[in-house]
């Protein structure tokens, strides 16, 4: 949580370092997912898209189904940023399917907004 707050206020490198330390020091699979996921977001916001991609992929190794939907959606946003719209759409659709299956209406709407935004970019 602290690492994500650091990312939000613009201290992305510090957020990445803190999340990495959490990842290496925890035995909790849930904490490994979130620390790696936050690392991906911090790297993305600092402009390191390759590092972010690796972190998002690695986070999926520790993801439960709901967490996987977060990883897919954020990874999809990264792919929108780099212009890989086809892969982003696939990731959004996969995240949407998980969220619909889990009956998470709040998250379904978030993913639908991401899909609509991508559609606007394509037109």
How would you describe each model-predicted region?
Residues 19, 23-26, 59, 63, ...:
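Eukaryotic all-alpha helical interaction scaffolds
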């Amino acid at each position: 949580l602290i690492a994500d707050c650091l990312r939000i206020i613009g201290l992305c490198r510090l957020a990445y370092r803190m999340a990495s330390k959490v990842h290496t020091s925890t035995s909790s699979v849930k904490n490994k997912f979130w620390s790696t996921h936050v690392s991906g977001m911090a790297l993305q916001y600092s402009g390191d898209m390759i590092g972010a991609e690796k972190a998002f992929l690695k986070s999926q190794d520790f993801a439960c189904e709901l967490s996987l939907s977060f990883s897919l959606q954020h990874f999809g946003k990264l792919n929108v940023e780099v212009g890989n719209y086809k892969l982003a759409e696939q990731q959004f659709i996969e995240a949407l399917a998980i969220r619909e299956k889990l009956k998470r209406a709040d998250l379904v709407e978030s993913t639908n907004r991401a899909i609509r935004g991508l559609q606007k970019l394509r037109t």
